[in-house]
Amino acid sequence: SVPCGRDGFLAVNSTIASIALLAKALFEMTNDDFYSLPNDFLRNNITPLERGKLQNLLKKDTVIVLHGGITTSVAYDLESKFSEVALGNIQLVDFRNFAHGRHYWISTRADETAILMLVGPDENSIAKKTSCILEGKIICESLSICEENVIGLLKMFVDVFQLVSFAGEEHNIDPGCPKVAEFGRKLYHLSYNPCTAPDHRKLKKSI
């Protein structure tokens, strides 16, 4: 069990605990400062997001989340949280693939779409150029970190948790304790272990 207590529906405590445990193990193995954890992260490293800045973004049906490098894992976590609690539709795309075709979505659906850029140090340049091109065409906001290490990663996760909380308030949903339908509870308790499924390669079945 994690010392921070029981998880809510979105398993925020477990997410942070897993990152911390993995970083601690990798630091002990490699002695690489990239994985070094601070002793007082919650006290000194959390900066509240400006809700007003994100209000218009949260009103849109679809949010395209641009990511790259260290922010990729955070992007996937954000998508899972929005989907699991029905906060909105999220499209995940890295900056390169957005530039190479995925931008067409906003050519026809700009009124119902916003863009959120998750920006690490390596993405600063491309994020600024992308933002300049899109200015005035679509709502475009960003969450940024300065550190290319596990501390920066944790900061970005905390920003995303705040964003999910804002989205919940916008849609009158408690992301940590949504009203789950009875069929959802039955699905959750279905027994299925892929490790015990037949190995069709061993059964020599042709495709």
Explain the meaning of each model-derived region.
Residues S1-S36, L42-I207:
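A SIS-like phosphosugar-recognition module
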